[in-house]
């Protein structure tokens, strides 16, 4: 083995043995620096005859290239190892909020929490989420839903209307989320299985009513849908939402223009000491309305009622939030009181899931 080969082998061994970047830099200077061993060999080329310079120069440059590549590879390896060691030493994940912060921290509003709880429950049953605009047409909000002209819900004291257009038509703030069901039936063919959460508006304000409130409605359209399916869905929802093992429900005849038959649903509960406990007791509490979709509604939305049938239900998100979490006044939900929110709000990581617990 020639002296050049011995030198190259020794330098490569020193590179491999370098334990940090400082040691590696010392090897680089010793080999390729101004007074380095390979630099010294390159300086001797000027004293050689042309033929020898050609041969020796090629060999020295090959050795220099091998050393340079080894230095680069070792430097990258040492940098990666240093970064891994630094990351391993830094145990704080700055991307996550603290569960018990030292400073005051914001809270998730109970309405947002309940909205997520509803979504988690119905998503587990295979429902998609459908959304629509708050500003609606009279056609979608009333006419296609079998509200005849002169129905009380069309009166000014119930509905927020915009100024009439030149053609006499008027837009309005939707009074329920049922227009989303209309838009869904107009835009897609059965089978349909959706929930429609959102803001709704009616001209009313007291301890249990606000001009703007939140609803969630559900819609199922298929060839074999019947009331038995509806009762099962509502029972499973109530058990999951109120986090009880069993729930008794009472279905009472009622009237809604868009369903036939129409039903109101009560849930068994026990009242006492300022609390409501579900799944036990001898009291009953109304929680929602439901029924089979009226054939006139199906026809108005382009669905043949001789082939398909379906059911729908609706409930106030604000109301069921108050029932579950013991809030007395609906208006407090919208007053932006930080003290109230600190009491009833949720921590940022309290994400509802059926596996982990909705309100844990």
Curated annotation (Swiss-Prot):
Biological processes annotated in GO: phenylalanyl-tRNA aminoacylation
Entry EC number(s): 6.1.1.20
KW Magnesium (keyword) present: yes
Entry's localization field: Cytoplasm
Coiled coil: none
A GO molecular function held by the record: tRNA binding
Keyword Translocase listed: no
Annotated positions binding Mg(2+): 260
Primary localization class, coarse: cytoplasm
UniProt similarity note: Belongs to the class-II aminoacyl-tRNA synthetase family. Phe-tRNA synthetase alpha subunit type 1 subfamily.
Subunit note: Tetramer of two alpha and two beta subunits.
Name the record gives this protein: Phenylalanine--tRNA ligase alpha subunit
